[in-house]
From Swiss-Prot:
Annotated GO biological process: CMP-keto-3-deoxy-D-manno-octulosonic acid biosynthetic process; lipopolysaccharide biosynthetic process
Keywords: Cytoplasm, Lipopolysaccharide biosynthesis, Nucleotidyltransferase, Transferase
Origin species: Aromatoleum aromaticum (strain DSM 19018 / LMG 30748 / EbN1) (Azoarcus sp. (strain EbN1))
UniProt function note: Activates KDO (a required 8-carbon sugar) for incorporation into bacterial lipopolysaccharide in Gram-negative bacteria.
The keyword Metal-binding is assigned to this record: no
Name this polypeptide is given: 3-deoxy-manno-octulosonate cytidylyltransferase
Keyword Cytoplasm carried by entry: yes
Substrates-to-products reaction catalysed: 3-deoxy-alpha-D-manno-oct-2-ulosonate + CTP = CMP-3-deoxy-beta-D-manno-octulosonate + diphosphate
Length: 258
C-alpha cells in the first residue's frame, strides 16, 4: 500500500450548521469521528487543519494532531497547501483531503484514492466517482458529474448533465439510457505535495468560476486528475441539521448492534 498523509480541513463557520465540527455524534465531536475513520485508513499521519481554537482543543483532547490555519483561505485546497508547508512534507508525498463533515467515510476508500494516485505517475490529483442511475440526479445542478477518458483521467466536471444523450434526451428525460457512462463525483481528493505547493499560484479559471468547482482550475492549467470508480455511492456527509440527525441515527444503530 502506498504511504500517504491525511489532512482534515475543519472550518468552524457554517451557514447552515454553525459550529459543525463540534456537533455531537454519539458522545464525540464530529471532527473526532472523522479523525477516527481516517486513522483506520493506515495513513502515516492524520492532521486536522482548523481556523478555530475550540476545534483545535477538541482534536488534541482526543489525542489527535491539529494545526491552526488562516481564516481567509478561499478553498480547502489552499488550506492544505498551508499545512504541507508547515509540516515540511516532501514534494512526492501523497496527501488525502478528507472533509471534516464526513463522519461515515469508509477508511478503505481513503486508502484506495491514495493508491490510485500512487499508481498513476502522470496525475497530480486522484479522486473518486460512482455510477449514477437516477435521471433526477443527472439533471440536478447540486450533483457534480464527471466524464473521463480511456485512461480514467477526468475530461471535465460539471453541474450540467454530462455526457448528453442527444437522441434519447430529445424525446424524454425520465430515465438514463442504458450504457450512458454517467458518473457522480465524490468529493474526496488525493494530491501530490508538489502540486499543492504550486496550486495557489495558478490563476482561477473562468470555468471554475462559472461552475463553482475548484477542481476545474487544475484541468484548465493542464494537470491530470485520475478518477477511481467505485461501485456504490459512499455515505453522504453533513451539510444540514437533517443530515446531522441522519448520521446520529446511523451511529446509534451501529452502537446498538456492536
Amino acid at each position: 500500500m502506498a504511504a500517504f498523509h491525511v489532512v482534515i480541513p475543519a472550518r468552524h463557520a457554517s451557514s447552515r450548521l454553525p459550529g459543525k465540527p463540534l456537533a455531537d455524534i454519539a458522545g464525540k465531536p464530529m471532527v473526532v469521528r472523522v479523525l477516527e475513520q481516517a486513522r483506520r485508513a493506515g495513513a502515516a499521519s492524520v492532521w486536522v487543519a482548523t481556523d478555530h481554537p475550540e476545534v483545535l482543543d477538541a482534536v488534541r483532547a482526543a489525542g489527535g494532531d491539529a494545526l491552526m490555519t488562516r481564516e481567509d483561505h478561499p478553498s480547502g485546497t489552499d488550506r492544505l497547501a498551508e499545512v504541507v508547508d508547515a509540516l515540511g512534507w516532501k514534494a512526492d508525498d501523497i496527501v488525502v483531503n478528507v472533509q471534516g463533515d464526513e463522519p461515515l467515510i469508509e477508511p478503505k476508500l481513503i486508502a484506495a484514492v491514495a493508491q490510485a494516485l500512487a499508481d498513476d505517475p502522470v496525475a497530480a490529483i486522484a479522486t473518486a466517482a460512482h455510477p449514477l442511475h437516477a435521471a433526477a440526479e443527472l439533471f440536478n445542478p447540486n450533483v457534480v458529474k464527471v466524464v473521463c477518458d480511456a485512461h480514467d483521467h477526468a475530461l471535465y466536471f460539471s453541474r450540467a448533465p454530462i455526457p448528453w444523450a442527444r437522441d434519447a434526451f430529445a424525446t424524454a428525460r425520465d430515465d438514463i439510457p442504458a450504457g450512458l457512462p454517467v458518473l457522480r463525483h465524490v468529493g474526496l481528493y488525493a494530491y501530490r505535495v508538489a502540486f499543492l505547493r504550486c496550486y495557489a499560484s495558478l490563476a482561477p479559471s473562468p470555468l471554475e468560476q462559472w461552475e463553482a468547482l475548484e477542481q476545474l482550475r487544475a484541468l484548465w492549467h493542464g494537470h491530470r486528475i485520475r478518477v477511481m470508480t467505485v461501485a456504490v455511492a459512499p455515505a453522504a456527509g453533513v451539510d444540514t441539521p437533517e443530515d446531522l440527525e441522519r448520521v446520529r441515527a446511523a451511529f446509534d444503530r451501529h452502537e446498538r448492534v456492536g
